[in-house]
């Protein structure tokens, strides 16, 4: 039984490693290949790489700098430690891998963004609208430890309707640019891992979640 639990934990670490690997490769490529705000179409106008940076949580929520940024980074680190502790505890109880898989996705996503926050300010020069960032610049990075910006790039404006073409829609549907866009948020692979992990747990592991009550 212990061997089964160890196998589940090992596969959870494999999931975390693969998510982190893809997330960081994509972020480093974007950071060293694109200027801030640059857009690269991938699938027509439905899927684009659009490079932005933010201080906040998934999808750019709760953005901010200074103390808020530091507090958010520390909170992420504490949350990751807690998630790893949960993974180890559950694996020792021979919890089914489906549960471990969902938690591993969430853990990997949280780790992907904390890597940006902790290290990117030290190892990259600043990205601007006219200049591509350099990895390990001679003059040092653009910010201190725990103050790096999170790199976002995945953009899916599947529906893009101008206000004049949808006058029947209420005004609050339209952004400052006068367009109703779905899906407007720009995010990264780590954000996607967190979101998929949460929905996976709610949809496919709800019976296990009920046992926590």
What are these regions (language model features)?
Residues 1-213:
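Alpha-helical transmembrane bundles and membrane-interface segments of multipass inner-membrane proteins
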């Amino acid at each position: 039984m212990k061997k089964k639990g160890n196998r589940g934990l090992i596969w959870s670490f494999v999931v975390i490693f693969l998510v982190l690997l893809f997330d960081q490769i994509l972020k480093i490529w974007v950071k060293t290949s694109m200027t801030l705000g640059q857009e690269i179409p991938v699938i027509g106008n439905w899927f684009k790489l659009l490079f932005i940076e933010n201080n906040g949580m998934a999808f750019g929520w709760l953005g901010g700098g200074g103390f808020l940024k530091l507090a958010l980074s520390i909170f992420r680190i504490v949350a990751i430690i807690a998630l790893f502790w949960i993974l180890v505890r559950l694996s020792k109880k021979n919890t089914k891998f489906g549960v471990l898989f969902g938690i591993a996705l969430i853990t990997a996503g949280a780790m992907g963004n904390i890597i940006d926050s902790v290290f990117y300010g030290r190892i990259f020069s600043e990205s601007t609208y006219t200049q591509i960032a350099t990895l390990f610049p001679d003059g040092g990075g653009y910010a201190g430890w725990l103050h790096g910006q999170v790199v976002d790039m995945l953009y899916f404006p599947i529906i893009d309707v101008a206000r004049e073409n949808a006058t029947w829609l209420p005004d609050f549907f339209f952004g400052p640019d006068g367009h109703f866009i779905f899906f407007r948020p720009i995010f990264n692979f780590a954000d996607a891992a967190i979101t998929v992990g949460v929905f996976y747990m709610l949809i496919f592991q709800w019976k296990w979640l009920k046992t926590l009550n």
